[in-house]
From Swiss-Prot:
Residues 46-136 form the ATP-cone domain. This is Transcriptional repressor NrdR. The keyword Coiled coil does not apply. Binds 1 zinc ion. Coiled coil: none annotated. The lineage of its organism: Bacteria, Bacillati, Actinomycetota, Actinomycetes, Acidothermales.
Length: 170
């Protein structure tokens, strides 16, 4: 790493820390030539390949803006939107790929958004999946109801004690 003061081609790492949100590493460095200290912030690049083929850096702000439109008029806080965007970025980075498609970004948004707000999920899914008719909405609502019923039944089953096989239960 070049020293920004004397342009010496080497530096020594004095301290390394992960930033608060965990997306970058902050390093304190020292130049062996001039002795001055400086800080660098290192992040792994995450790029999004859009449908048009254009590649641009991943932007949490864009995720938040898109989800905010779906949440308009809904009781969803800015903190919840920021947390959702963080979860989306974490999921995309966990793939280990430096480039993801806009389709993958949309898919990564759907899960956390469904947990956050059903109506916002339906709004986002309608744009993301290109709903063209009432039947598309009805099919998605039916799917959500079926999944919700399945989740409830699994919760009830886990909550009930398993009957013992005693002498009288044969």
């Amino acid at each position: 790493m070049y020293c920004p003061f004397c342009r010496h081609p080497d530096s020594r790492v004095v301290d390394s820390r992960v930033t608060d949100d965990g997306t970058a590493i902050r390093r304190r460095r020292s130049c062996p030539e001039c002795g001055r200290r400086f800080t660098t912030v290192e992040t792994a690049a995450l790029s999004v390949i859009k449908r048009s083929g254009v590649i641009e850096p991943f932007s949490r702000a864009k995720v938040i803006a898109g989800v905010r439109k779906a949440c308009q008029g809904r009781p969803v806080s800015e903190d919840a939107l920021a947390l959702l965007a963080q979860r989306v970025e974490d999921e995309l980075r966990a793939t280990g790929c430096s480039e993801v498609t806009s389709q993958e970004v949309g898919l990564a948004v759907l899960g956390p958004l469904r947990e956050l707000d059903d109506v916002a999920y339906l709004r986002f899914a309608s744009v993301y999946r290109g709903f063209e008719s009432l039947e598309d909405f009805e099919a998605e609502i039916a799917l959500q109801r079926a999944e919700r019923a399945l989740e409830r039944s699994e919760t009830v089953e886990r909550g009930r004690p398993v009957p013992s096989r005693g002498v009288d239960d044969r």
